[in-house]
Amino acid sequence: MTSSSSFSRFDGRAQDQMRAVKITRGFTSNPAGSVLVEFGNTRVMCTASVELGVPRFKRDSGEGWLTAEYAMLPAATAERNRRESMAGKVKGRTHEISRLIGRSLRAAVDLSQLGENTIAIDCDVLQADGGTRTASITGAYVALADAIKVLQERGVVPGSPLLAPVAAVSVGLVDGNVCLDLPYEEDSRADVDLNVVMTEHGEFVEIQGTGEETTFTRAQLNDMLDHAEKGCRELVAAQKAALGI
């Protein structure tokens, strides 16, 4: 672990320590799956809704589809942000995160076992304090699992399309020190910022990483990935505990 004896984190955690994680199922009653996920002060509502039919490019394929949308409530941050729908344009960051969530969750489901049905994932950030996209992915997996259970109970899906759990966490270099699960105060001044998505089996789904006006070495990258792997293992354990498996 890269560490400086004089370095201390904003909230007093160890460098490889997650914030408190809480996953609450059944947060709302209308969707097939609904979860409130909390990474410290970051709180995201993740829902999974079932829609009959698939997009045109999937029609007559016999396969299902999973899509995702991400948004932040205006008061999710300290300074209110105008709703993007009212501004008439969805920001590039929002599109990027929506696509990331969709890709990550498609790695957790066998689309060939869904039939021609669509699962729509919606992640709405209620309160943002860093790690909103990683919290969204982690919570959305649990909502997805509940939605698939509903499909099975209805007899729509005879098999088990759900694959190994997928979770995500942020990791970065803060003042040259590798830190896991960055809150906003650390994320906003990190030298390097990574978002890592992994399966229960330790396989990578996606790695997003950038140097913020700096560079990083292969050794530092390996150190960050080791931290991320530890965090994802803990998150998968939290997902399974929430699902009672």
Curated annotation (Swiss-Prot):
Q: EC number(s) of the enzyme?
A: 2.7.7.56
Binding residues for phosphate, per the UniProt record?
R93, G131, T132, R133
PROSITE patterns on file: RIBONUCLEASE_PH (PS01277)
Subunit organization: Homohexameric ring arranged as a trimer of dimers.
| EC supergroup of this enzyme | transferase
What's the protein called, per UniProt?
A: Ribonuclease PH
Q: Which PANTHER family match?
A: EXOSOME COMPLEX COMPONENT, EXOSOME COMPLEX COMPONENT RRP41
Q: Which family does it belong to?
A: Belongs to the RNase PH family.
Q: Which UniProt keywords apply?
A: Nucleotidyltransferase, RNA-binding, rRNA processing, Transferase, tRNA processing, tRNA-binding
Gene behind this protein: rph
Function, as annotated = Phosphorolytic 3'-5' exoribonuclease that plays an important role in tRNA 3'-end maturation. Removes nucleotide residues following the 3'-CCA terminus of tRNAs; can also add nucleotides to the ends of RNA molecules by using nucleoside diphosphates as substrates, but this may not be physiologically important. Probably plays a role in initiation of 16S rRNA degradation (leading to ribosome degradation) during starvation.
Q: Which BP terms in the Gene Ontology apply to this protein? A: rRNA catabolic process; rRNA processing; tRNA processing
Please give the organism. Corynebacterium glutamicum (strain ATCC 13032 / DSM 20300 / JCM 1318 / BCRC 11384 / CCUG 27702 / LMG 3730 / NBRC 12168 / NCIMB 10025 / NRRL B-2784 / 534)
